[in-house]
Amino acid sequence: MTIKFLSENTINRIAAGEVIERPASVVKELVENAVDAGSTKIDIILERAGKNLIIISDDGIGMTDKELEIAVERHTTSKLDESDFLNIHTFGFRGEALPSIAAISKMLITSKKQGYDKAFQIKLIGGNEKQVTISVHNEGTKIEIRDLFFATPARLKFLRSDKTELVATVDVVKKIALAHPKISFSLTHDDRNLLKFKGHNKDVETNLKQRIIDVIGDDFIKNAAYIDFKTPDFSICGYTSIPTYNRASSEDQFLFINNRPVKDKLLQVALRVAYQDYLARDRYPLCAIFLQIDPQLVDVNVHPAKAEVRFHDPNYVRNLLIEAIKNALTNTSHVTSTTIASDALQLFKNHLVNKQPSVSKAVSVNSKPTDYRPAMSPSFKSTPNTDCQKLIDTLPHAKIEQEVERRIEREQQAHKQYKLGAAKAQLHTTYIISQTEDSIVITDQHAAHERLGYEKIKDYLKTEELIRQRLLIPEIVELPNERNADSLYENREKLYKLGLTLEKFGEKSIIVTEIPNILGDVNVQKLIHDLADHLSDFGENIALTELIEHVTETYACHYSIRAGRKLSADEMNALLRQMENTPFSGQCNHGRPTYIELKLKDIERLFGR
């Protein structure tokens, strides 16, 4: 077969295969173009999740007839300066989107440039039959895409159900809307309005906060820490959830580089490391985090869809993001999710409704069964018992009254002075009930004390080494490859401080001679393999943090107050005071709350007061 040049239309269809995977890809490319055009309002209309029709309308700068003709040709763009290719500030720059979409659909573009009298229209079918005509339109651009993938039926067969494709498009619009709070967005599907975000024109922080409420919800903002972190060439802002407000998946994690939504493994690892001490491995925080970096320090031209980026110094970026998130979380370290109390109150309400007695079964307070007989009670004379009176007379009344008054005063001060209030009771020898000025607090004594122990051993490890236990028979661990063995050996000094002593044994094996004493009868093979995997996948930060977490969790669990142990009032109050002075005491080591606060006004509502 001889080598030959491909036709322009074939080239565009190949490019479309890289850039346009589904209707959501079309919406992404065209909405980003509208953003680059300086739009303040962008409307999206879909039919059958975009398979039949996609319309994107904006009030941006618009195009002339000549610009319309050029715009649908490959590698034409108004956004890229050839002399400064690395300094990219716009979303689009490759000049591939419009011709690629046109090659696999029926496209109609109508546009009127700002300051011009006439509007123009260009029509393309499968990338051909380009016709520019005069039209009528407001300033801005409207692009209609019909019968997507009609020219590539094989790609059409790979599309998912309308519901699945629509979910993907909604996700795309939400991400772009988050990055541009000043722009109004609307999304309509089959004549049903799905999204409507009004543009916000206040200060940057207020705009961002309001748009996050629009997209993710008010509950997230109420349970999130604000991030504001800056270096000379780097800034991070946004919101990230407190540990007790988490999800079972990472769907609600929105990460942006220079306002570009990205799915970047390095950033996801940094997020995981930042929450390492506070969340179980199968739980995920919610976040909307925006990283602003000098465009010359990040390469966005890694993938045609521009979903991936490459950093000039990835470790620097990762460490900054970890530090920024941890700093933000420190400011909310004693807070638990606001939804926990409301969920608990809802359970109470449901229980009250389900257990409400019917009218026919209701019993009058004053009614008595027919066979009721009052129990015989001891007879008391109106004059006091002489022996009792003598005993009472001998008691130091003044001292008793003073002590009672002092105790009442101390408790009243505790209600006002301490966030977790004064302990009042212990429920089922597991939960501490305390009272503040306007609420009651229920504390899980085991989870709370476990967290206190966890933080204590973490502080200890900053300056001290763990006690090591020498294995009677050194364990030889064979690893999958030489790289895993080398990475473990390179970190042997750090591992030694954590109580793990190892030596190289051949190309792919490690000999373990000592383990942290606190771990006891641990599976050494699994421990080393897990460490090697984490070093390989995520780097030393998260791998060593995994080991620290394993050690500290074991220590904290072994030495914490168990559920079922009876505590005195002084012990309960001492635990509450320690919690108030310990970072991140609001959640256990797995992200579950250590206490729940029920406001008095909410309790009163339960009783209809």
UniProtKB/Swiss-Prot annotation:
Example GO biological process: mismatch repair
Statement: the UniProt record of this protein carries the keyword DNA damage: yes
GO cellular component terms given for this protein: mismatch repair complex
Pfam family, one: HATPase_c_3
Xref: InterPro entries: DNA_mismatch_repair_CS (IPR014762), DNA_mismatch_repair_MutL (IPR020667), DNA_mismatch_S5_2-like (IPR013507), HATPase_C_sf (IPR036890), MutL/Mlh/PMS (IPR002099), MutL/Mlh/Pms-like (IPR038973), MutL_C (IPR014790), MutL_C_dimsub (IPR042120)
Stretch list, region Disordered: 364-386
Entry annotated with the keyword DNA repair: yes
HAMAP family reported in the protein's UniProt record: DNA_mis_repair
Family membership noted in the UniProt record: Belongs to the DNA mismatch repair MutL/HexB family.
Function: This protein is involved in the repair of mismatches in DNA. It is required for dam-dependent methyl-directed DNA mismatch repair. May act as a 'molecular matchmaker', a protein that promotes the formation of a stable complex between two or more DNA-binding proteins in an ATP-dependent manner without itself being part of a final effector complex.
Record-given protein name: DNA mismatch repair protein MutL
This protein's encoding gene: mutL
